[in-house]
Amino acid sequence: MSDQSPLALAHALIRCPSVTPEEGGALSFLAERLTEAGFSVERPVFSEAGTPDIENLYARIGTAGPVLVFAGHTDVVPPGEAASWTHGPFSGEITDGFLYGRGAVDMKGGIACMLAATLSFLDRHGPDFGGSIAFLITGDEEGPAVNGTVKLLDWAKARGERFDHCLLGEPTNPDSLGEMIKIGRRGSLTGRITVHGRQGHVAYPHRAENPIPGLLRLASALIAEPLDGGTAHFDASNLEFTTIDVGNPATNVIPASAKAVFNVRFNDDWTAETLGAEIRKRLEAAAGNAVRFSLDLQPSNSPAFLTQPDAFVDLVADAIAAETGRRPALSTTGGTSDARFIKDACPVIEFGLVGRTMHETDERVAVADLDRLTAIYGRVLERYFSS
């Protein structure tokens, strides 16, 4: 295989053990290939108290507009027990038409396709193609996401960098390549409810105040009615309780407090502030004067957002349809991604590989999908800079 093929590039990246926060050689590999292709490359390191230092990569070729950004992350989640894998998690084994390894789909495979498409595009057009291409790559997406894309964007802005559009290579397709583009993401808000009672002996309930019935009352109030009915591009917002805790191993003691944690994935009807106010209103109405509670809402850096379907969305969808024969759905489903940060810099959409095995043992990608995704990204580049 050519060392410029997406398979060769993905194989090399997978062999870099870049579990967050380790760089593992992945950014060094990208920097070398991009530098050889004529990009200016920088690798800023960002820090914050209580979090590990993270190395990032910013590369650009061209000085004119428009500027198309390819974005992604080289960090991966831990592989778990290596013995559970059919092939080593960082071996990059190629078997029966599949490339195995942690990050194969999330998202070293996607980065390899972006790089392969860009190198091929530059081979055809040279450095004077009527615009600029940038790579915005972090090593802190699977971790706290504190010293990664959000700070890399601030760093780039301070240097006068401006972007027109961004394509983020997250694995957006549920089952087969070409199914789905992400044009937005739901927001995420986490909260903790604590109901305050008074500890006592179960044989003397009149001397105690059991917080558990009150907590159940409040929890029921939050899920009794839907938060909304969905919007044009989003499903209805969804609140799920993730834990209810009393921390009481004794069977003859009424506990002093009871706690519950919930998470809401919310649509563009809400901001974190308006949603928090609605949750508090429902809790206060249910509590009345009978239940003493406190509500702690964790600060959210995950707002709901939407990139309005426009000419850029159509351009990417057309490239996908030309290569796969299907028109992708425009979706806002799934979890959060670094698109939530990029949206403040420029319009961003996401399209990458099939995510069925991401974060799993034996994560793998079809070699044919690497070739097809590279062809799609190549079509995007051709159409973007010709238009």
From Swiss-Prot:
GO terms for biological process: diaminopimelate biosynthetic process; L-arginine biosynthetic process; lysine biosynthetic process via diaminopimelate. The active site is at residues 75, 141. Binds 2 Zn(2+) or Co(2+) ions per subunit. Zn(2+) 2 binds at residues 106, 142, 359. Keywords: Amino-acid biosynthesis, Cobalt, Diaminopimelate biosynthesis, Hydrolase, Lysine biosynthesis, Metal-binding, Zinc. It comes from the Bacteria. Its cofactor is Zn(2+); Co(2+). It catalyses: N-succinyl-(2S,6S)-2,6-diaminopimelate + H2O = (2S,6S)-2,6-diaminopimelate + succinate. The keyword Secreted does not apply. Homodimer. NCBIfam families: dapE_proteo, PRK13009.1. This is Succinyl-diaminopimelate desuccinylase. It comes from Methylorubrum populi (strain ATCC BAA-705 / NCIMB 13946 / BJ001). The lineage of its organism: Bacteria, Pseudomonadati, Pseudomonadota, Alphaproteobacteria, Hyphomicrobiales.
